[in-house]
Curated annotation (Swiss-Prot):
Function, in words: One of the primary rRNA binding proteins, it binds specifically to the 5'-end of 16S ribosomal RNA.
GO cellular component, one term: cytosolic small ribosomal subunit
GO MF entries: rRNA binding; structural constituent of ribosome
Protein name: Small ribosomal subunit protein uS17
Family as reported in the entry's similarity comment: Belongs to the universal ribosomal protein uS17 family.
UniProt key word Oxidoreductase: no
Organism: Haloarcula marismortui (strain ATCC 43049 / DSM 3752 / JCM 8966 / VKM B-1809)
UniProt subunit comment: Part of the 30S ribosomal subunit.
Coiled coil segments of this chain: none
Keywords on record: Ribonucleoprotein, Ribosomal protein, RNA-binding, rRNA-binding
Length: 112
């Protein structure tokens, strides 16, 4: 099933109704990239994003972060530290309105 996003469908299958690939969940709206900060909740991950905000008084930038809870389908194997892509969907709970649609492969060279 095509999501309309530039992500690969996972090879594993799942019986999750809230999976955008194998279930009935449709995605719309914004897509975000971030790092998985927590996998403690069942079928949920917390994705953390860092961004810069300009402080006009000092003419400098300050780091901020936002944490977005997202649904983790069973077909995606997620761990803390993974860089993932999440997409907006209908509200799944009081705080969850995003779903993980893919894991971004980290391109690391041996130039350390």
């Amino acid at each position: 099933m095509a999501l309309g996003l530039n992500v690969q469908e996972p090879e594993e299958t799942c019986a999750d109704q809230n999976c955008p690939f194998h279930g009935e969940l449709s995605v719309r709206g914004q897509t975000l990239n971030g790092e998985v900060a927590s996998t403690d909740m069942e079928k949920t991950v917390v994705v953390e994003r860092e961004y810069d905000v300009k402080v006009p008084k000092y003419d400098r930038f300050m780091k901020r972060r936002s944490r977005v809870p997202a649904h983790a389908p069973d077909c995606l194997d997620l761990a803390v530290g993974d860089t993932v892509t999440i997409a907006e969907c209908r509200p799944l709970s009081k705080t969850k309105s995003h779903v993980v649609v893919g894991v971004v492969a980290d391109e690391q060279d041996g130039d350390a």
